[in-house]
Structures are given as structure tokens and as C-alpha cells.
């Protein structure tokens, strides 16, 4: 098959991928929420009888005054905790800047008049201290400012003395180098009656339109995991259509925002209910409810969960739950994207530059495919040499396609030519290209990652469109280097001539890292073509 047709095949596959991707985002079937039977109903409070505070009906007209909040500073973030309920209402990620050259940290959780994104946890049940009807507990704290400083761990205890004389302590534990927080309710039942409580954790997020595009789609919404479903996205539209109500052992819930995630992870051996809701005011809510605990008089009980707020760091997420790293969603080619990501990290650890690491991946891929590439050009050269015989067959058999096809197969067999031999390298390159596309799109490590000169962020488009234009020029050179069959259809010739322009336009808005991969791949292909064609000419093949 002619190389020109291969390039057309690339274009069709590429455009089909983009269209399929957009269709998935807009038209994919909504998942059906079904209650799982892995947990006996008696072990977990009924979803409809729970007293979890609902998502607020609207954004608050005013937010809690900053002087009332408890500020916790570690080496990774600055968190603010509201003493009313002990909710985490603000998180500034110190290692991740809002703007590449700016000083302001990236803020994930925040409670403002425009954006409402908080992590809430509490105790419900007969003796719970948080309720949608009676309100939240007002905790006391020894200080309004806590700093990890030179410590490896930092504990922030909040205390609440209930009317029955029972002391509830909500203990936050922070760790150096980590984005996760332990939230531990310690209940000392000094009363004469048995207590019954249940922990919940939920994430509330105001629904706003995603800023992604067809070329760089990003997901903003919820996700969850159960014993039967390791990972499932649950978009805001899904949440509006139907509330979740799933019983499971362990599990987790999360809110995703491109490179960042917030997640509640209850103990893996606990029996929980995963739930969701959307308020009339536009607040999406996803959370978990744990098992009911009976606390006898004179005893103490600890009920805990972990909360993560930070980048989609696969290693850190896996440490919390073996499936939480799946929030780094590489799509249907995840099995190929994972080794590509590992190789990218490996190269970067040596060279210290993500752009150079992408170049090394390109050289690795092209090197691995070189035997197939050589076979491709050899097959195409043989096919070109067969064109006169194929033209003669067309004249002899006319419109008799059956005889024509049979004669062609006999000719291919006699000349030892595989008419599909030129397609294999193309078909192998496309999955690699798509997998790398998702790696560059999903990997937080490439956010604000510079290359050289004007390319200061490989995760966004080239600001001056230099690389996409160079890529188009390289495609044009490749096209000119490849002999064009005289029998080629005129319409196909026209399409071929426009293909570099079409690709250039497509790549104008692609991440610079992906354009770099394709550009370097083209330059390597041009070099390989010259070497292969020189060898073919010595064998009398042109």
C-alpha cells in the first residue's frame, strides 16, 4: 500500500479519535446506580434515614470570617478548618503555583461567594453531634494557628463537650511530605447510657462549566470506588439525574479537577454507603457513611478516615487505597499509558528536563519500530514496482472484480509482497500516540514543566505556534520524499497535499509536549527514510 494512503490513514484515525473522544464526553450512556448486596443492610444505617447535613441549597451569601478559622501550615499546604463542624474549607498547595511565574499557590478547596468547594465530616446517628436539623458541633481549639515547622507529624485536636457530658475530640494528624490528613473522632463516653454514632465524610462542590476544549478535554466532577467497581466517574450531570446509594466494604469518594483531586478514604475493612446528591442551588455532593458504633458507658471509641487534597500523585494515592491512583485516568489505553508514564519519569530522573525526556521516548519508540518501518518501506517499494502489472490486470479484467482480486492475490504471493505490510507501523504508532496524549494530559508532573527557549510549559499549547508549523513542514518534507504512484487517484492526491496543513491546524492547540513528540518523530522518520531508500536503491527497488 502506498505511503500516501498510510498518511491518510493516520489522519482518519486521528480525527476519528478526536470525534469519538468528544462523543464520549457528550453522549456516553449514563451509568446506572445500583445498590450492591455485598453488605448486609443491618450493618449500615439506611441511606434514606441518615441525618447527614445536605448540600446547601445555595452558595452562602457570606463566608465565615477568616479570623474564626483554624489555620494549619505544613511543608505541602496551608489548610483552614472551620470550628463549626470541623470542616476543611480552604487548601492552598504550596508546591504548586497558580501561575507558572507567580508567587500565589494553587488553591483547591475554597469557600468564597463564587466557588464553594469544601471537605466535610461529622458524626450522625442517635447521639451524633452533626445534624441537618439541629446544626453542627462548635469545636474548641487551643490555638488558631498550627505549624508543622521542623516536626514530622502535627496533631490538631478540636474538642466538643455535649449536653450529656460526653467529650468528643476531632483529631487532625498531618505528616511531612504528604497531602493526606488523618481525621479521627475520639469519643469518651462518660455518661451512664450507651451511645450510638456513625461517621460520614463528604465533599461539596459548586457546579461550574468545565474550561476544557476538544483538543484538551479535562474532567471536573466526582468519582468513587466500591468493592465491585474499582473506579467509576460520576459526573455532575449523572449526579443530577440520580443519587448514588451503594453499599460496599471499604471504597472511597473523590472530586476531580484536572491535575488535582480531593478524596475521602474510610478504612478498607469498614462497611460503608457511598452516596451523592445535588442541591437546587447547584451544589454537588458525594460522600460516604460508615457503620454504626455502639459505645458502652465508661468506654472510649475511635472512628477515623483519611482525607487527601493535592495533585494526582499516583504513588501517594496508591498508598491510601490500591485503586485511588485510578483517578489518573488514561482511558482505554491505560495498559499502554502506564509504562509510557513510567519511562517518561525514568528518563526525566536522569536528564532533569521533561522535554528531553519526551525526545528520548520518541527515539525509543522509533527505534523499536524501525524493523517494521523498514519492512513498510520495502513493501511499498515492491508495490510500486508492481504497478505496471496491476495496471495491465485492470485493463484485462475490466469490471470483473472477482477475477481481478484473485489475480492480484496470486501476483502478491508470487512476488512475496504483503499489500498490508505498509499499514502495520502506522497502526502501532497510533495507540502509542494516543496513550502519550493522555499521559501528557493527565500527569500533574508536566504542569508548568519547561523545555527550552519559549516553551515554558509542556502541558499547554506553543504560545507562538512555532512547533506546530515546524511539524507541518516536516510532514511536507516526508511527503515529498515519498514517490507517488502514477495510478494514484487525483482526489487522493489533493487530499495528500492538504494533509500537512490539516495536521498543522489540529496541532496548533495541542500540548507542546505532544507536538514535540510528533515533530521529533517526523525528523527521525525523515532520517530513517533516507537510510532505507538508499539501501533499497542498491537492491534495485525505488
From Swiss-Prot:
Belongs to the OXA1/ALB3/YidC family. Type 1 subfamily. Keywords: Cell inner membrane, Cell membrane, Chaperone, Membrane, Protein transport, Transmembrane, Transmembrane helix, Transport. Disulfide bonds: none annotated. It is found in: Cell inner membrane. This is Membrane protein insertase YidC. Its main location: membrane. The lineage of its organism: Bacteria, Pseudomonadati, Pseudomonadota, Gammaproteobacteria, Alteromonadales. One of its GO terms (biological process) is protein transport. Residues 32-57 are annotated as: Disordered. Residues 32-41 have a biased composition (Polar residues). GO terms for molecular function: membrane insertase activity. Required for the insertion and/or proper folding and/or complex formation of integral membrane proteins into the membrane. Involved in integration of membrane proteins that insert both dependently and independently of the Sec translocase complex, as well as at least some lipoproteins. Aids folding of multispanning membrane proteins. InterPro entries: Membr_insert_YidC (IPR019998), Membr_insert_YidC_N (IPR028053), YidC/ALB3/OXA1/COX18 (IPR001708), YidC/Oxa/ALB_C (IPR028055), YidC_ALB_C (IPR047196), YidC_periplasmic_sf (IPR038221). It is a multi-pass membrane protein. Signal peptide: none annotated. HAMAP family: YidC_type1. GO terms for cellular component: plasma membrane. Interacts with the Sec translocase complex via SecD. Specifically interacts with transmembrane segments of nascent integral membrane proteins during membrane integration. The chain crosses the membrane at residues 6-26, 326-346, 350-370, 421-441, 458-478, 501-521.
Amino acid at each position: 500500500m502506498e505511503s500516501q494512503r498510510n498518511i491518510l490513514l493516520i489522519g482518519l484515525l486521528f480525527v476519528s479519535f478526536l470525534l469519538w473522544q468528544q462523543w464520549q464526553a457528550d453522549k456516553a450512556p449514563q451509568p446506572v446506580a445500583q445498590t450492591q448486596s455485598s453488605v448486609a443492610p443491618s450493618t449500615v444505617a439506611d441511606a434514606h434515614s441518615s441525618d447527614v447535613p445536605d448540600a446547601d441549597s445555595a452558595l452562602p451569601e457570606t463566608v465565615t470570617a477568616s479570623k474564626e478559622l483554624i489555620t494549619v501550615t505544613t511543608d505541602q499546604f496551608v489548610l483552614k478548618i472551620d470550628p463549626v463542624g470541623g470542616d476543611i474549607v480552604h487548601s492552598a498547595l504550596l508546591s504548586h503555583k497558580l501561575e507558572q511565574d507567580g508567587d500565589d499557590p494553587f488553591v483547591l478547596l475554597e469557600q468564597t461567594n463564587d466557588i464553594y468547594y469544601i471537605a466535610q465530616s461529622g458524626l450522625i446517628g442517635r447521639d451524633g453531634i452533626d445534624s441537618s436539623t439541629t446544626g453542627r458541633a462548635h469545636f474548641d481549639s487551643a490555638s488558631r494557628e498550627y505549624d508543622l515547622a521542623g516536626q514530622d507529624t502535627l496533631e490538631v485536636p478540636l474538642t466538643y463537650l455535649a449536653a450529656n457530658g460526653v467529650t468528643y475530640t476531632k483529631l487532625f494528624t498531618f505528616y511531612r511530605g504528604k497531602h493526606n490528613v488523618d481525621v479521627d473522632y475520639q469519643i469518651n463516653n462518660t455518661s451512664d447510657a450507651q451511645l450510638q454514632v456513625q461517621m460520614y465524610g463528604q465533599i461539596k462542590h459548586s457546579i461550574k462549566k468545565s474550561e476544557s476544549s476538544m483538543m484538551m478535554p479535562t474532567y471536573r466532577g466526582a468519582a468513587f470506588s466500591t468493592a465491585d467497581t474499582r473506579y467509576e466517574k460520576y459526573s455532575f450531570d449523572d449526579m443530577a439525574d440520580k443519587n448514588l446509594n451503594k453499599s460496599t466494604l471499604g471504597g472511597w469518594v473523590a472530586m476531580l479537577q484536572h491535575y488535582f483531586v480531593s478524596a475521602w478514604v474510610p478504612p478498607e475493612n469498614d462497611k460503608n454507603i457511598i452516596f451523592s446528591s445535588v442541591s437546587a442551588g447547584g451544589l454537588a455532593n458525594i460522600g460516604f457513611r460508615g457503620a454504626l458504633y455502639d459505645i458502652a458507658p465508661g468506654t472510649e471509641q475511635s472512628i477515623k478516615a483519611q482525607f487527601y487534597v493535592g495533585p494526582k500523585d499516583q504513588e501517594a494515592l496508591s498508598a491510601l487505597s490500591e485503586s485511588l491512583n485510578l483517578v489518573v485516568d488514561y482511558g482505554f489505553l491505560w495498559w499502554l499509558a502506564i509504562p509510557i508514564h513510567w519511562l517518561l519519569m525514568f528518563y526525566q530522573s536522569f536528564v532533569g528536563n521533561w522535554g528531553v525526556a519526551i525526545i528520548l521516548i520518541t527515539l525509543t519508540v522509533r527505534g523499536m519500530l524501525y524493523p517494521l518501518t523498514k519492512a513498510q518501506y520495502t513493501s511499498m517499494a515492491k508495490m510500486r514496482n508492481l504497478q505496471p502489472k496491476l495496471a495491465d490486470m485492470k485493463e484485462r479484467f475490466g469490471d470483473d472484480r472477482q477475477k481481478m482480486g484473485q489475480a492480484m492475490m496470486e501476483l502478491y504471493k508470487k512476488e512475496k509482497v504483503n499489500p498490508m505490510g505498509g499499514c502495520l507501523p502506522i497502526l502501532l504508532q497510533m495507540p502509542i500516540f494516543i496513550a502519550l496524549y493522555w499521559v501528557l494530559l493527565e500527569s500533574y508532573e508536566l504542569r508548568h514543566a519547561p523545555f527550552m527557549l519559549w516553551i515554558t510549559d509542556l502541558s499547554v499549547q506553543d504560545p507562538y505556534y512555532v512547533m506546530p508549523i515546524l511539524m507541518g513542514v516536516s510532514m511536507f518534507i516526508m511527503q515529498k520524499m515519498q514517490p507517488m504512484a502514477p495510478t494514484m487517484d487525483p482526489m487522493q492526491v489533493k487530499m495528500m497535499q492538504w494533509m500537512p496543513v490539516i495536521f498543522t491546524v489540529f496541532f496548533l492547540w495541542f500540548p507542546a509536549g505532544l507536538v514535540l513528540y510528533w515533530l521529533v518523530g517526523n525528523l527521525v522518520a525523515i532520517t530513517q527514510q533516507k537510510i532505507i531508500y538508499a539501501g533499497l536503491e542498491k537492491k534495485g527497488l525505488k
